[in-house]
Amino acid sequence: MNPKMILTGVSKKYTLYRNNTEKLKAMFFPKTREQHRDFYALKDINLEVYEGETIGVIGINGSGKSTISNILASVIPPTEGEMTVNGETSLIAINVGLNKNLNGYENIEQKCLMHGFSKKEIEELMPAIEEFADIGDFIDQPVKSYSSGMKSRLGFAISAHTNPDILIVDEALSVGDKTFYQKCKDKIDEFKAQNKTIVFISHNIKEIKNLSDRVLWLHNGEVREFGDKNEVIKQYEDYINWFNKLSKEEKEAHKQELKEMRSLAPSLYEEQENGKAGSGGDGTQPIVQPKRDKQAVKSAVWFFSQLVVFAVIFLTAAYFLVVPQLTDGSGSEELEQVAVGAEVQAGTSMGDIDNSDVSL
């Protein structure tokens, strides 16, 4: 089978800021980023999806499912690693790809134009898309007035009729009714019969079992398991059952541990996995806190040095802008008067010199 999507060492990293002021400061002063922690939404993902496959993606909230769907659809780029996609992708997700200020017809036209359709082709597709979405008179209304189900209907209808090579469905069926769900399932089965590749992301295990050939379990931003759907789903359900049996305090501690692990640098993460991180060598203290005092001093010195440079540039620019204005208008008249006065005085002095010469 031919691979349609290949991910090699793909990671997505975000820098966490406490507020918008710190984020803005980091944009203009990159060195201040050293004070903030990096968070891995995805880490070292290696994955191959073949032509005609339907891959189900499962995982608890925050495991990286939506991030990987956005990367596969080229909505966002990976921070690290390489990705190869052989074919045109179409992402179906709530609130993704729809302009909230445009109505249904305008969104259909916009998305079809982005997929390379001509005006004539769009006119021919419009009735089929409108019928599939089945949102009634709301097709004439701005998308911002739609419910989540309506957005999902319209998004799926557009993507299904643009005939993509790879269809990525991210929780888009979770907000629809049973009638619409069956309609979407029939369309997905039609795509499978056409040997198209589908990535299906859902919390609904029953949907994953019914639609998928293989299942990817993402956990804490990493691939926990990938393979036979029955085996992977069983392991996932065992984990969920184990987690649900924990006390409230144990659940919070487990969540905090996972959160801290995703914030580690790669080398520290490897040490954590090998049980070398922490003061006791048992991985109990995975986070190495940066020396914020020294970093703060360095950042402050660097910030004020940049401020001085900016002040010098500003004053220099102001000098060259203000001085020429002094020679215009009233300023030039004053200079002319000064010049005339100087000439008169010089003439008087010369007359005195001439008179003295005569007297001599």
Swiss-Prot record:
Domain ABC transporter intervals: 24-245
Its Enzyme Commission number?
Answer: 7.5.2.4
Q: Where in the cell is it found?
A: Cell membrane
- What is the recorded membrane topology of this protein? Peripheral membrane protein
| Broad class of the protein's primary localization | membrane
Q: Which reaction does it catalyse?
A: ATP + H2O + teichoic acidSide 1 = ADP + phosphate + teichoic acidSide 2
Statement: the UniProt record of this protein carries the keyword Signal: no
Name the top EC class. Answer: translocase
What keywords sit in the KW lines?
ATP-binding, Cell membrane, Membrane, Nucleotide-binding, Translocase, Transport
From the UniProt entry, list the residue stretches annotated as the region Unknown. Answer: 246-360
Binding site residues for ATP: 59-66
Please list every transmembrane segment annotated in the UniProt record, as residue ranges: none
Cited InterPro entries = AAA+_ATPase, ABC_transporter-like_ATP-bd, ABC_transporter-like_CS, ABC_transpr_TagH-like, Bact_Polysacc_Export_ATP-bd, P-loop_NTPase
An annotated Gene Ontology molecular function:
ATP binding
Mind telling me which GO cellular component terms the entry cites?
A: plasma membrane
Give the region (Disordered) as residue ranges.
Answer: 270-290
Q: Which family does it belong to?
A: Belongs to the ABC transporter superfamily. Teichoic acids exporter (TC 3.A.1.104.1) family.
Q: What does this protein do?
A: Part of the ABC transporter complex TagGH involved in teichoic acids export. Responsible for energy coupling to the transport system.
Protein name, per record:
Teichoic acids export ATP-binding protein TagH
